[in-house]
Design a protein with these regions (language model features):
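Ferredoxin-like iron-sulfur electron-transfer modules
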Residues: 302-321, 334-337
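C-terminal helical cap(s) of enzyme catalytic domains, especially alpha/beta-barrels
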Residues: 49-61, 181-201, 247, 259-284
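Catalytic cores of alpha/beta
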Residues: 25-31, 89-100, 154-167, 220-227, ...
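Glycine-rich phosphate-binding active-site loops on the catalytic face of alpha/beta enzymes
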Residues: 41-47, 108-114, 167-181, 236-238, ...
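Iron-sulfur cluster-binding cysteine motifs and their immediate structural context
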Residues: 246, 324-337
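Glycine/Thr-rich beta-alpha phosphate-binding loop at enzyme active sites
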Residues: 113-130, 160, 167-229, 263
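N-terminal capping/small domains of soluble enzymes
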Residues: 1-89
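Active-site beta->alpha loop and helix N-cap motifs at the rims of alpha/beta catalytic domains
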Residues: 57-128
Length: 337
């Protein structure tokens, strides 16, 4: 399962993504001991920001000394710093300071949707000109591999992605969480999380966003100007099959947060064993050999076969007589049944 990402040799493709699951030495070392290959630890800024409480909801930098310690204690693991600045000087300063700490690479956060100030996070990722300016600022402070984390809150990720690469980014990551409002109460008229009776537009994550992440990864992988640019897929991975999607669509790295929050670091066992089993039964020697294999199969809607007709099929062994197939086909399938 070993694979290279940004010229960094990784024992497997699976990293903790930039979030609370990788915010201190103890948490990250535990994950490393369990088999995770690397971490993009919680975004570091040069400005103070207060968290609200509660800040989560479900649906029905020089103070980070542990980065150098991690590299000393786990030399075979990959440690990446996520950074976010308010202006060009901030980005340059953060890049320079984190480079001194001995990390392996930098990830620039152009995609977080729930910022307390304008001009940060996803506001940057939506604007190719800002992406260009800030990537160049980071480059002035570091020669480490640079990963630009792109936002899903755009019609097309391609323009900002091209801007990032042209400005000096070595790799691209997608996606971050998606702007949303969830669970609006009919009693309080507030969505969740409810903070003193109010809510705000926040970031939606979890397995439901995975197909959206697949599309953004494909858009970048299929763009000629981004050919051979390493891709990191993040968004909705819960099991090895989800991870396989990203690999087949061109990713050489996979980042995970929400599934860890739900099930713990132990999900690495399923990710590794499932992917190994897939490679074994398909007689594939290395995970590198499947990267991008699905790209030729994705075509424009106008290129799909219009002659073939599929007819309803039934698995009588699994049928329990609930009648849902009849309802779906009769009420929503042109009365196929």
């Amino acid at each position: 399962l070993s694979i290279d990402f940004c010229d960094l040799h990784c024992e497997n493709p699976f990293f903790l993504s930039s979030s609370v699951v990788g915010s201190n030495y103890e948490m990250i070392s535990k994950a490393f001991d369990m088999g995770w290959a690397g971490v993009v630890y919680k975004t570091i800024t040069s400005f103070a920001h207060e968290e609200v409480s509660p800040r989560f909801a479900t649906t029905p930098g020089t103070h980070h000394g542990f980065d150098g310690r991690l590299k000393k204690d786990y030399p075979g693991k990959i440690v990446i710093a996520s950074i976010m600045g308010q202006n060009e000087d901030d980005w340059t300063f953060l890049a320079r300071e984190l480079t001194k700490a001995g990390i392996d690479a930098l990830e620039c956060n152009f995609s977080c949707p729930h910022m307390a100030y304008d001009g940060l996070g996803t506001d940057v990722g939506e604007d190719p000109a800002l992406v260009d300016r800030y990537v160049r600022a980071i480059r002035r402070g570091s020669n480490l591999p640079l990963i630009a984390k792109m936002t899903a809150n755009v019609t097309s990720v391609v323009p900002p992605a091209i801007a990032a690469v042209n400005a000096g980014a070595d790799a691209l990551a997608a996606i971050n969480t998606i702007k949303s409002i969830v669970n609006v109460s009919g009693d309080t008229f507030s969505g969740e999380p409810c903070v003193s009776g109010k809510t705000a537009v926040g970031g939606y994550s979890g397995n439901a966003v995975h197909p959206i992440a697949n599309r953004f990864v494909y858009d970048m992988a299929a763009t000629p100007q981004l050919k051979n640019i390493p891709l990191s897929g993040t968004g909705g991975v819960e099991n090895w099959q989800d991870a396989l999607d990203f690999l087949l669509l061109g990713c050489t790295n996979i980042q995970i947060t929400t599934a860890i929050m739900q099930y713990g670091y132990r999900i690495i066992d399923d990710l590794l064993s499932g992917l190994k089993h897939y490679l074994k039964i398909h007689h594939i020697s290395n995970v590198r050999d499947i990267v991008g294999k699905a790209l030729p199969q994705v075509v424009g809607a106008d290129a799909l076969d219009r002659e073939t007709i599929c007819y309803p099929k039934f698995n009588h062994k699994q049928c329990i007589g609930c009648g849902r197939c009849y309802i779906s086909c009769y009420d929503g399938g042109h009365q196929a049944l």
